[in-house]
Amino acid sequence: MKQISSGEVWRWNKEVEMNSIRDCLKHCSSIAIDTEFPGCLKETPMDASEEIRYRDMKFNVDNTHLIQLGFTLFDRRGFAKTWEINLSDFDEHKCFKNDKSIAFLKSNGLNLDKIREEGIGIDEFFRDFSQILTEKDGKITWVNFQGSYDNAYLVKGLTGGKPLPETKEEFHETVQQLLGKFVFDVKKIAESCSGLSSQFGLQRIADVLQMKRVGKAHHAGSDSELTARVFTKLTFDLLNSRKQSVRRVDHQQFQLEQQQHQQFMMTRCYIPIPMPIPRPRPVMFAAHHQNPYFGGGYFRMPVQGMNYVL
Protein backbone atom coordinates (compact mmCIF):
# COMPACT_ATOMS: atom_id res chain seq x y z
CA MET A 1 0.00 0.00 0.00
CA LYS A 2 1.35 3.38 -0.97
CA GLN A 3 0.98 6.15 1.59
CA ILE A 4 -0.61 9.15 -0.18
CA SER A 5 -0.92 11.78 2.54
CA SER A 6 -1.86 12.38 6.13
CA GLY A 7 -3.28 15.26 8.05
CA GLU A 8 -3.86 16.41 11.60
CA VAL A 9 -7.32 17.71 12.35
CA TRP A 10 -7.71 20.68 14.70
CA ARG A 11 -10.46 23.13 15.42
CA TRP A 12 -9.02 25.68 12.99
CA ASN A 13 -8.86 23.30 9.96
CA LYS A 14 -11.81 21.04 10.78
CA GLU A 15 -14.04 22.16 7.90
CA VAL A 16 -11.38 21.58 5.26
CA GLU A 17 -10.35 18.18 6.61
CA MET A 18 -13.91 16.94 7.12
CA ASN A 19 -14.66 17.78 3.49
CA SER A 20 -11.51 15.89 2.53
CA ILE A 21 -12.69 12.85 4.51
CA ARG A 22 -16.06 13.06 2.76
CA ASP A 23 -14.43 13.16 -0.69
CA CYS A 24 -12.01 10.33 0.09
CA LEU A 25 -14.79 8.11 1.40
CA LYS A 26 -16.45 8.30 -2.02
CA HIS A 27 -13.57 6.23 -3.42
CA CYS A 28 -12.58 4.12 -0.40
CA SER A 29 -14.67 1.47 1.30
CA SER A 30 -12.36 0.54 4.20
CA ILE A 31 -11.46 2.48 7.35
CA ALA A 32 -8.71 1.45 9.76
CA ILE A 33 -9.13 3.07 13.15
CA ASP A 34 -7.13 3.59 16.31
CA THR A 35 -7.91 5.46 19.51
CA GLU A 36 -5.82 7.06 22.22
CA PHE A 37 -7.57 7.49 25.56
CA PRO A 38 -6.64 8.13 29.23
CA GLY A 39 -6.19 4.46 30.07
CA CYS A 40 -8.26 2.04 32.11
CA LEU A 41 -9.70 3.13 35.45
CA LYS A 42 -10.56 -0.48 36.22
CA GLU A 43 -7.98 -2.98 35.01
CA THR A 44 -9.23 -6.41 34.01
CA PRO A 45 -7.45 -9.63 35.13
CA MET A 46 -6.06 -11.82 32.37
CA ASP A 47 -8.27 -14.77 33.36
CA ALA A 48 -11.49 -12.73 33.59
CA SER A 49 -14.66 -13.97 31.93
CA GLU A 50 -16.13 -12.26 28.87
CA GLU A 51 -18.87 -10.75 31.02
CA ILE A 52 -16.35 -9.21 33.44
CA ARG A 53 -14.23 -7.93 30.55
CA TYR A 54 -17.22 -6.18 29.04
CA ARG A 55 -18.36 -4.79 32.39
CA ASP A 56 -14.92 -3.28 33.01
CA MET A 57 -14.69 -1.89 29.47
CA LYS A 58 -18.12 -0.29 29.81
CA PHE A 59 -17.08 1.36 33.08
CA ASN A 60 -13.82 2.66 31.59
CA VAL A 61 -15.35 4.00 28.36
CA ASP A 62 -18.39 5.53 30.04
CA ASN A 63 -16.17 7.50 32.44
CA THR A 64 -13.34 8.70 30.18
CA HIS A 65 -12.91 10.90 27.10
CA LEU A 66 -11.16 10.18 23.83
CA ILE A 67 -7.93 12.10 23.25
CA GLN A 68 -7.15 11.14 19.66
CA LEU A 69 -8.94 9.23 16.91
CA GLY A 70 -7.00 7.94 13.92
CA PHE A 71 -8.60 7.14 10.55
CA THR A 72 -6.92 5.62 7.51
CA LEU A 73 -9.14 5.27 4.45
CA PHE A 74 -8.07 2.70 1.86
CA ASP A 75 -9.33 0.30 -0.78
CA ARG A 76 -8.24 -2.78 -2.73
CA ARG A 77 -6.01 -0.69 -5.00
CA GLY A 78 -4.02 0.53 -2.02
CA PHE A 79 -5.06 4.19 -2.17
CA ALA A 80 -4.92 5.60 1.35
CA LYS A 81 -5.11 8.77 3.35
CA THR A 82 -4.71 9.17 7.09
CA TRP A 83 -6.26 11.63 9.50
CA GLU A 84 -5.42 12.17 13.16
CA ILE A 85 -8.31 13.89 14.90
CA ASN A 86 -7.40 15.73 18.10
CA LEU A 87 -10.29 15.91 20.56
CA SER A 88 -10.45 18.58 23.22
CA ASP A 89 -12.77 17.14 25.89
CA PHE A 90 -10.06 15.55 28.02
CA ASP A 91 -8.70 17.78 30.77
CA GLU A 92 -5.70 16.21 32.45
CA HIS A 93 -6.36 18.09 35.68
CA LYS A 94 -10.09 17.39 36.00
CA CYS A 95 -11.02 14.23 34.13
CA PHE A 96 -10.69 10.62 35.23
CA LYS A 97 -7.50 9.01 34.00
CA ASN A 98 -4.92 6.31 34.58
CA ASP A 99 -1.76 8.16 35.59
CA LYS A 100 0.55 5.52 34.10
CA SER A 101 -1.27 5.69 30.77
CA ILE A 102 -1.05 9.49 30.68
CA ALA A 103 2.68 9.35 31.43
CA PHE A 104 3.08 6.77 28.65
CA LEU A 105 1.27 8.95 26.10
CA LYS A 106 3.37 11.96 27.06
CA SER A 107 6.57 9.95 26.75
CA ASN A 108 5.54 9.12 23.18
CA GLY A 109 5.09 12.76 22.26
CA LEU A 110 1.42 13.56 22.77
CA ASN A 111 0.99 17.23 23.68
CA LEU A 112 -2.09 17.06 25.87
CA ASP A 113 -2.14 20.80 26.54
CA LYS A 114 -2.21 21.63 22.82
CA ILE A 115 -4.88 19.02 22.16
CA ARG A 116 -6.99 20.49 24.95
CA GLU A 117 -6.61 24.04 23.63
CA GLU A 118 -6.81 23.49 19.86
CA GLY A 119 -8.69 20.24 19.46
CA ILE A 120 -12.28 19.60 18.35
CA GLY A 121 -15.14 18.83 20.70
CA ILE A 122 -16.10 15.15 20.60
CA ASP A 123 -19.80 15.82 20.05
CA GLU A 124 -19.03 18.31 17.29
CA PHE A 125 -16.78 15.89 15.46
CA PHE A 126 -19.11 12.90 15.66
CA ARG A 127 -22.09 14.96 14.56
CA ASP A 128 -20.25 15.82 11.35
CA PHE A 129 -18.76 12.35 10.96
CA SER A 130 -22.15 10.65 11.39
CA GLN A 131 -23.49 12.80 8.57
CA ILE A 132 -20.58 11.78 6.34
CA LEU A 133 -21.26 8.09 7.03
CA THR A 134 -24.91 8.44 6.06
CA GLU A 135 -23.82 9.89 2.71
CA LYS A 136 -21.60 6.90 1.96
CA ASP A 137 -22.94 4.79 -0.90
CA GLY A 138 -22.18 1.20 -0.03
CA LYS A 139 -20.92 -0.77 2.93
CA ILE A 140 -17.82 0.12 4.91
CA THR A 141 -15.21 -2.33 6.16
CA TRP A 142 -13.85 -1.33 9.58
CA VAL A 143 -10.40 -2.52 10.62
CA ASN A 144 -8.72 -2.26 14.01
CA PHE A 145 -6.04 -3.91 16.11
CA GLN A 146 -7.21 -5.43 19.40
CA GLY A 147 -10.12 -3.13 18.85
CA SER A 148 -12.67 -3.69 21.60
CA TYR A 149 -12.04 -0.23 23.02
CA ASP A 150 -11.82 1.30 19.54
CA ASN A 151 -15.29 -0.03 18.74
CA ALA A 152 -16.58 1.03 22.14
CA TYR A 153 -15.45 4.65 21.75
CA LEU A 154 -16.91 4.74 18.24
CA VAL A 155 -20.24 3.50 19.59
CA LYS A 156 -20.14 6.09 22.36
CA GLY A 157 -19.36 8.89 19.91
CA LEU A 158 -21.90 7.84 17.28
CA THR A 159 -24.67 7.61 19.92
CA GLY A 160 -24.03 11.12 21.24
CA GLY A 161 -22.04 10.11 24.30
CA LYS A 162 -24.62 7.73 25.73
CA PRO A 163 -23.45 4.97 28.09
CA LEU A 164 -22.61 1.68 26.43
CA PRO A 165 -25.28 -1.06 26.43
CA GLU A 166 -25.62 -3.08 29.61
CA THR A 167 -24.58 -6.46 28.18
CA LYS A 168 -21.96 -7.58 25.71
CA GLU A 169 -24.66 -9.14 23.54
CA GLU A 170 -26.44 -5.78 23.28
CA PHE A 171 -23.10 -4.11 22.59
CA HIS A 172 -22.36 -6.47 19.68
CA GLU A 173 -25.81 -5.78 18.25
CA THR A 174 -25.18 -2.03 18.52
CA VAL A 175 -21.80 -2.35 16.80
CA GLN A 176 -23.46 -4.22 13.94
CA GLN A 177 -26.23 -1.62 13.67
CA LEU A 178 -23.80 1.33 13.59
CA LEU A 179 -20.77 -0.11 11.80
CA GLY A 180 -22.22 -3.06 9.90
CA LYS A 181 -21.12 -6.68 9.69
CA PHE A 182 -17.66 -6.06 8.27
CA VAL A 183 -15.55 -5.32 11.35
CA PHE A 184 -12.12 -7.01 11.40
CA ASP A 185 -9.53 -7.28 14.15
CA VAL A 186 -6.00 -7.65 12.76
CA LYS A 187 -4.83 -9.27 16.00
CA LYS A 188 -7.26 -12.14 15.41
CA ILE A 189 -6.34 -12.41 11.74
CA ALA A 190 -2.71 -12.90 12.80
CA GLU A 191 -3.71 -16.18 14.45
CA SER A 192 -4.22 -17.69 10.99
CA CYS A 193 -0.88 -16.52 9.59
CA SER A 194 2.31 -18.56 9.61
CA GLY A 195 5.05 -17.03 11.76
CA LEU A 196 2.66 -14.74 13.63
CA SER A 197 0.72 -15.00 16.85
CA SER A 198 -2.25 -13.31 18.45
CA GLN A 199 0.16 -12.56 21.30
CA PHE A 200 2.13 -10.16 19.09
CA GLY A 201 1.56 -6.43 19.26
CA LEU A 202 1.06 -4.29 16.17
CA GLN A 203 4.68 -3.16 15.99
CA ARG A 204 6.05 -6.69 16.33
CA ILE A 205 3.82 -7.94 13.53
CA ALA A 206 4.95 -5.03 11.36
CA ASP A 207 8.58 -5.90 12.14
CA VAL A 208 8.03 -9.54 11.13
CA LEU A 209 6.48 -8.31 7.88
CA GLN A 210 9.39 -5.87 7.42
CA MET A 211 7.12 -2.84 7.36
CA LYS A 212 8.40 0.56 8.39
CA ARG A 213 6.17 2.79 10.47
CA VAL A 214 5.14 6.20 9.18
CA GLY A 215 5.02 8.67 12.08
CA LYS A 216 5.27 7.98 15.80
CA ALA A 217 4.03 4.93 17.65
CA HIS A 218 1.06 5.39 19.97
CA HIS A 219 -0.25 8.29 17.96
CA ALA A 220 -3.71 7.46 16.60
CA GLY A 221 -2.95 8.45 13.01
CA SER A 222 0.27 6.47 12.73
CA ASP A 223 -1.23 3.41 14.41
CA SER A 224 -4.27 3.41 12.12
CA GLU A 225 -2.05 3.74 9.03
CA LEU A 226 0.12 0.81 10.11
CA THR A 227 -2.99 -1.21 10.95
CA ALA A 228 -4.30 -0.64 7.41
CA ARG A 229 -1.05 -1.78 5.80
CA VAL A 230 -0.71 -4.85 8.02
CA PHE A 231 -4.35 -5.79 7.33
CA THR A 232 -3.84 -5.43 3.58
CA LYS A 233 -0.68 -7.54 3.67
CA LEU A 234 -2.13 -10.32 5.82
CA THR A 235 -5.38 -10.63 3.91
CA PHE A 236 -3.50 -10.61 0.59
CA ASP A 237 -1.16 -13.36 1.81
CA LEU A 238 -4.05 -15.41 3.19
CA LEU A 239 -5.91 -15.09 -0.10
CA ASN A 240 -2.86 -16.21 -2.07
CA SER A 241 -2.28 -19.07 0.35
CA ARG A 242 -5.88 -20.17 -0.09
CA LYS A 243 -5.58 -19.97 -3.87
CA GLN A 244 -2.40 -22.06 -3.76
CA SER A 245 -4.14 -24.60 -1.54
CA VAL A 246 -7.02 -24.79 -3.99
CA ARG A 247 -4.57 -25.24 -6.87
CA ARG A 248 -2.78 -28.02 -4.96
CA VAL A 249 -6.08 -29.73 -4.24
CA ASP A 250 -7.12 -29.33 -7.88
CA HIS A 251 -3.79 -30.78 -9.04
CA GLN A 252 -4.09 -33.72 -6.66
CA GLN A 253 -7.66 -34.28 -7.82
CA PHE A 254 -6.49 -34.15 -11.44
CA GLN A 255 -3.76 -36.71 -10.75
CA LEU A 256 -6.25 -38.98 -9.00
CA GLU A 257 -8.68 -38.71 -11.88
CA GLN A 258 -5.88 -39.46 -14.36
CA GLN A 259 -4.90 -42.58 -12.41
CA GLN A 260 -8.51 -43.71 -12.25
CA HIS A 261 -8.90 -43.08 -15.99
CA GLN A 262 -5.76 -45.06 -16.79
CA GLN A 263 -6.92 -47.95 -14.65
CA PHE A 264 -10.30 -47.85 -16.37
CA MET A 265 -8.73 -47.83 -19.83
CA MET A 266 -6.44 -50.72 -18.93
CA THR A 267 -9.43 -52.67 -17.74
CA ARG A 268 -11.33 -51.92 -20.92
CA CYS A 269 -8.59 -52.16 -23.54
CA TYR A 270 -5.31 -53.64 -22.40
CA ILE A 271 -6.10 -56.69 -20.31
CA PRO A 272 -6.29 -59.73 -22.69
CA ILE A 273 -9.86 -60.72 -23.21
CA PRO A 274 -10.30 -64.48 -22.67
CA MET A 275 -11.32 -66.44 -25.75
CA PRO A 276 -14.94 -67.60 -25.69
CA ILE A 277 -15.46 -71.27 -24.97
CA PRO A 278 -16.61 -72.87 -28.25
CA ARG A 279 -19.87 -74.69 -28.39
CA PRO A 280 -19.26 -78.46 -28.31
CA ARG A 281 -19.50 -80.04 -31.70
CA PRO A 282 -21.13 -83.42 -32.33
CA VAL A 283 -18.62 -86.21 -32.76
CA MET A 284 -18.53 -87.79 -36.25
CA PHE A 285 -17.84 -91.50 -36.53
CA ALA A 286 -16.86 -93.36 -39.71
CA ALA A 287 -19.62 -95.83 -40.46
CA HIS A 288 -17.49 -98.31 -42.39
CA HIS A 289 -14.40 -98.41 -40.18
CA GLN A 290 -13.71 -100.35 -37.01
CA ASN A 291 -12.20 -97.30 -35.43
CA PRO A 292 -14.89 -94.66 -35.63
CA TYR A 293 -12.30 -91.84 -35.44
CA PHE A 294 -11.00 -92.51 -38.98
CA GLY A 295 -12.38 -92.37 -42.45
CA GLY A 296 -15.40 -90.89 -44.18
CA GLY A 297 -19.08 -91.83 -44.42
CA TYR A 298 -20.05 -89.98 -41.24
CA PHE A 299 -23.04 -90.14 -38.96
CA ARG A 300 -23.71 -88.14 -35.84
CA MET A 301 -23.25 -89.44 -32.31
CA PRO A 302 -25.64 -87.76 -29.89
CA VAL A 303 -24.00 -85.50 -27.27
CA GLN A 304 -25.66 -85.12 -23.86
CA GLY A 305 -26.91 -81.63 -23.12
CA MET A 306 -27.11 -80.50 -26.74
CA ASN A 307 -30.84 -81.20 -27.17
CA TYR A 308 -30.12 -84.30 -29.13
CA VAL A 309 -32.36 -87.33 -28.78
CA LEU A 310 -30.55 -90.21 -27.16
From Swiss-Prot:
Residues bound to a divalent metal cation: D34, E36, D150, D223
Cofactor: a divalent metal cation
Sorted UniProt keywords: Cytoplasm, Exonuclease, Hydrolase, Metal-binding, Nuclease, Nucleus, RNA-binding, Transcription, Transcription regulation
Superkingdom in the source lineage: Eukaryota
EC number(s) recorded for this UniProt protein: 3.1.13.4
A Pfam family hit: CAF1
Protein's job: Ubiquitous transcription factor required for a diverse set of processes. It is a component of the CCR4 complex involved in the control of gene expression.
Assembly and binders: Component of the CCR4-NOT complex, at least composed of CRR4 and CAF1 proteins.
Name the record gives this protein: Putative CCR4-associated factor 1 homolog 3
Gene that encodes the chain: CAF1-3
